[in-house]
Amino acid sequence: MYNFNKPIGSYGEHISENFLVSKGHKILTKNFRCRSGEIDIISSHNNYICFTEVKTRYNYSFGIPCESVTITKIKKIRNTAKFYIYINKLFKNNFKFNVIEIILNKYSNDYSINFIENAF
């Protein structure tokens, strides 16, 4: 059985990357991974390093996308961000943790974006 979650997530990350660039963000890295976890998009914007989690869905049958960013997921993102900050020596920077929710239209190429700055 084919798992559609990965291509849907990748498509959502692509949409999110374009959205952030259109808002003036400079993409530093995508899908940063370490033992602690993964961060979908890391960007810089207005003297902030922004760590962005992307959640993409076709509908709300499993709740709104940001509800899947649980306390456990937040801890993993924070620990991964700490590691990124450490290895890149970014100690003097300001930081933001954002969430982008994307709802795709199953029948067309339309989608809606909800950008939640300083989500946690």
From Swiss-Prot:
CDD domains: PoNe_Nuclease (cd20736). It holds the Pfam family UPF0102. Gene3D superfamilies: 3.40.1350.10. GO terms for molecular function: nucleic acid binding. Belongs to the UPF0102 family. NCBIfam families: PRK12497.1-3. PANTHER family: UPF0102 PROTEIN YRAN (PTHR34039:SF1). This is UPF0102 protein NT01CX_2205.
